[in-house]
Amino acid sequence: PDPLVDLFKKVLPHQPHHGTGKTHMASALCMLACERRLEARFFTASSLVMRLRRARDEGRLDREATLIGRARLLVIDELGFLPLDPDGARLLFQVFADAYERQSVVITTNLEFSRWGAVFGDDQMAAAVIDRIVHHGRLVQFRGESYRVRNALMQEG
């Protein structure tokens, strides 16, 4: 077993503040996987749902799911940033269900688990996703002020 793959096994960077480095860390893990010649995929949650919806509408959802499932590392960024409609929630749930115990998954979010029911529009579906994540997962919390705010050109004064 590759220790790098073990490192990213279901990592969940979480911090209820923007600009603390969650996406940066997820991108770095994706790049590291690629440097190790491991297939990796990086999506925002909303772009992944749009991609899956388009594939389904074009009759190629199984093929798209297979392509996503081939990646050793799957990054889903900004989960909960935009709400999911019921159809999108079901499509995203299927990605989590397919990835469970087969792929390493990194999810970035600003939301605590208690708020995921609102994201998926269904408390039971959210609970099933959370159950799969926490089984083998690691929660990584980011603290501090926003990097973008700290380094903003537009400052008070």
Where are these regions (language model features)?
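Hydrophobic positions on the alpha1 helix immediately C-terminal to the Walker A/P-loop
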Residues: 25, 29
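Conserved lysine of the Walker
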Residues: 22
